[in-house]
Curated annotation (Swiss-Prot):
Family note: Belongs to the activator 1 small subunits family. RfcS subfamily.
Subunit relationships: Heteromultimer composed of small subunits (RfcS) and large subunits (RfcL).
Keywords for the protein's UniProt record, in alphabetical order: ATP-binding, DNA replication, Nucleotide-binding
Name of the protein in its database record: Replication factor C small subunit
Function summary: Part of the RFC clamp loader complex which loads the PCNA sliding clamp onto DNA.
Gene Ontology MF annotations: ATP binding; ATP hydrolysis activity; DNA binding; DNA clamp loader activity
Lineage of source species: Archaea, Thermoproteota, Thermoprotei, Sulfolobales, Sulfolobaceae
SMART domains registered for this protein in UniProt: AAA (SM00382)
């Protein structure tokens, strides 16, 4: 059914012409389509910036509607072993390419999760089948790709998408799906997802279940407290009102079902932002301590005890606090 389709897939660009961002990359890829020739490619950049989309659009433009016959997509996170290289990749690389385009394409998504041995095997396979196959490797961290592969590929760096591009795309999707929205809700999605288009579209789809996309519904679907509530808790602690701050903490833990890790990450963001006025020397102390608390929580320490201790530390520094917005 239509409503069950993931919007991130439904609105994924089908051709290079439909990709509105990463313009320099798109222009370079279009030249490959025009010439019907290309080197092995390495797409590097954060999640949700269009690496897989660009690869799929490229092969669609190269082969047309029958692109699946000449294209193999593997996720290296699911299949990290050397057998993937020796079996699936080699089997596909041996088969005949299209008459129109003299090579087939293999996309290895999340290639930075491949083992070093698998990458070495891939390097040898790339050399062996260069005449009939082109490889596109997509990774989040370029440093995790071995140098012999980097030297055999053309590098394309993908950057987080601009706010204007993401917001406009989300508004277009909301209108197309006939979902009411508050512009601040759309902007909040960008502020949280930070240029990750796939995550942003997933959030807007989840928030649409509430009937209207607002700041409140966005934070609800993400399981996060609104920044103003985190600031209220910090303000109480920094004003010396430890017990009230602890009550607010318990409210966040119980009412929102937040984990201690979720809360301390939001606390860190508020401490390093501009909404709370804290002297720089105090800010350094608190951010450092927030890091310690997050480490202990991740190691299995009790969420409430660790966060209460953090609030107590804030309360002890109350005389240095000059208030906040």
């Amino acid at each position: 059914m239509e409503e069950e389709i993931l919007w991130a897939e439904k609105y994924r660009p089908k051709s290079l012409d439909e990709i509105v961002n990463q313009k320099e990359i798109v222009e370079r890829l279009k030249k490959f389509v025009k010439e019907k020739n290309m080197p092995h490619l390495l797409f590097a950049g954060p999640p949700g910036t269009g690496k897989t989309t660009a690869a799929l659009a490229l092969v669609r433009d190269l082969y047309g509607n029958n692109y699946r016959q000449y294209f193999l997509e593997l996720n290296a996170s699911d299949e990290r072993g050397i057998d993937v290289i020796r079996n699936k990749v080699k089997e596909f690389a041996r088969t005949v390419a299209s008459n129109n385009v003299p090579f087939k394409v293999i996309l290895l998504d999340e290639a930075d999760n491949m083992t070093a041995d698998a990458q070495q095997a891939l390097r040898r396979t790339m050399e062996l089948y260069t005449e009939t196959t082109r490889f596109i490797l997509a990774c989040n961290y370029l440093s995790k790709i071995i140098e012999p592969i980097q030297s055999r590929t053309a590098l394309f760096r993908f950057y987080p998408l601009k706010k204007e591009d993401v917001v406009n795309r989300l508004i277009q999707i909301a209108k197309n799906e006939k979902v009411e929205f508050d512009p601040k809700g759309i902007e909040t999605i960008f502020d949280i997802t930070q240029g990750d288009m796939r995550k942003a579209i997933n959030v807007i789809q989840a928030a649409s279940a509430y009937g209207k996309i607002t700041v409140e519904t966005v934070y609800k679907v993400l399981g996060l407290a609104q920044p103003k509530e985190i600031r209220e808790m910090l303000h109480l602690a920094l004003s010396g009102k430890f017990l009230q701050a602890r009550d607010k903490l318990r409210e966040l833990l119980i009412n929102y079902g937040l984990s201690g890790e979720d809360i301390i990450k939001q606390v860190h963001k508020e401490l390093t932002g501009n909404e709370i006025s804290i002297p720089d020397d105090l800010k350094v102390i608190l951010v450092d301590y927030a890091g310690e608390v997050e480490f202990r929580i991740m190691e299995g320490a009790d969420d409430e005890i660790q966060l209460s201790a953090f609030l107590a530390k804030l309360a002890l520094h109350a005389e240095k606090y000059s208030g906040g917005k």
